[in-house]
Swiss-Prot record:
Its cofactor is [4Fe-4S] cluster; [2Fe-2S] cluster. It comes from the Bacteria. Keywords: 2Fe-2S, 4Fe-4S, Biotin biosynthesis, Iron, Iron-sulfur, Metal-binding, S-adenosyl-L-methionine, Transferase. It comes from Marinobacter nauticus (strain ATCC 700491 / DSM 11845 / VT8). The keyword Iron-sulfur applies. CDD domains: Radical_SAM. One of its GO terms (molecular function) is biotin synthase activity. Binds 1 [4Fe-4S] cluster. The cluster is coordinated with 3 cysteines and an exchangeable S-adenosyl-L-methionine. One of its GO terms (biological process) is biotin biosynthetic process. Pathway: Cofactor biosynthesis; biotin biosynthesis; biotin from 7,8-diaminononanoate: step 2/2. The keyword Cytoplasm does not apply. PANTHER family: BIOTIN SYNTHASE, BIOTIN SYNTHASE, MITOCHONDRIAL. This is Biotin synthase.
């Protein structure tokens, strides 16, 4: 079997051996495989919006939205559909090809589902790919989302099965795998990855990748997050992750899942340009673009554009901002619009 063949039978030992290759050898191998499947100078750009923030009943130790921890985050109601569509338009003008919507729920409620489905339809009508992360899904809920036109569903495994109970106790690893199975059955694409730097060891990091790569079908999108430590969460004082270990994980993900988009997700604000460039060299080819990821900071849009220009990178499917002048105009509009994020449902109902 060749090194670049799509496999679903990876062992932990094989993943360890990849991770521990000399750094230059690992990046060379990852970049070579990357070039067989993707344009090395093209990056898929997504924008992420929190459509319902805070008071989540889950106890994920990394998350400021958990109702179990005092992080100072105020609970907000489900955003108006009009507000979501307006944000999606701005994202499209900034060059995003995919618009992702996240809600701090254990799973979507029946009363909120019609609003969520309408969000999908209206964002889809703008010509954007759509992605949602709403917690666990039953088969019928997944089918409803697929019928509404949802392209991707995000549901991360977060870490290895071995380390999982150190991070989350309110839902099981199997619960997460069942949701992924329901998403696949409904015909949607899967966005699934994890978080590095939560106190896990090397085997947990590569173990997560083994779990992902041995799914019946590789996730189309694999977000690799670097922990953003938030005051008030149990992980606020965890030891920092070595940047080279993070880059190694990106490279191993690329080798093990050669045709998946590997996304630099949360934690990019803590990465300098050189680290991000090495991640792109290691095979990352997707980012979240915009000033915020749900509730945590992200590099400013103009900083991302400057980095892209330095590296000669172009966004996938970028049609709305063909010139530098249009890019700068769209960014200015987005920054101005950011100051008006106050339109929430006035209804007395609140989503838990």
């Amino acid at each position: 079997m060749t090194a670049t063949a799509t496999r679903h039978d990876w062992t932990l030992q094989e993943a360890r051996e990849l991770f521990n290759l000399p750094f230059n050898d690992l990046l060379f191998r990852a970049q070579s495989i990357h070039r067989e499947h993707f344009d090395p100078n093209e990056v898929q750009v997504s924008t992420l919006l929190s459509i319902k923030t805070g008071a989540c009943p889950e106890d994920c130790k990394y998350c400021p939205q958990s109702g179990h921890y005092n992080t100072g985050l105020e609970k907000e109601k489900l955003l108006e559909i009009e507000k979501v569509v307006a944000e999606a338009r701005v994202a499209r003008e900034k060059g995003a090809s995919r618009f992702c919507m996240g809600a701090a729920w254990r799973s979507p409620s029946k009363k909120d589902m019609p609003y969520v489905l309408d969000m999908v339809r209206q964002v889809k009508s703008l010509g954007l790919e759509t992605c949602m992360t709403l917690g666990m899904l039953k088969e019928e809920e997944a089918k409803e989302l697929a019928d509404a036109g949802l392209d991707y569903y995000n549901h991360n495994l977060d870490t290895s099965e071995k380390y999982y109970n150190h991070i989350i106790t309110t839902r099981t690893y199997q619960d997460r795998l069942d949701t992924l199975d329901n998403v696949r059955k409904a015909g949607m694409k899967v966005c699934c990855g994890g978080i590095m730097g939560m106190g896990e060891d090397e085997d947990d990091r590569v173990g997560l990748l083994v779990q992902l790569a041995n799914l019946p079908q590789h996730p189309e999108s694999v977000p690799v997050n670097m922990l953003v430590k938030v005051k008030g969460t149990p992980l606020e004082d965890v030891e920092d992750l070595d940047p080279f270990d993070f880059i190694r994980i990106i490279a191993v993900a690329r080798i093990m899942m050669p045709a998946s988009h590997v996304r630099l997700s949360a934690g990019r604000e803590q990465m300098n340009e050189q680290m991000q460039a090495l991640c792109f060299m290691a095979g990352a080819n997707s980012i979240f673009y915009g000033e915020k990821l749900l509730t945590t900071s992200n590099p400013e849009a103009d900083a991302d554009m400057q980095l892209f220009r330095k590296l000669g990178i172009r966004p996938e499917q970028r049609e709305q901002c063909a010139t530098e002048e249009q890019e700068e105009e769209a960014i200015a509009e987005a920054v101005e619009y950011e100051a008006t994020r106050h339109m929430f449902y006035d209804a007395t109902r609140e989503s838990a």
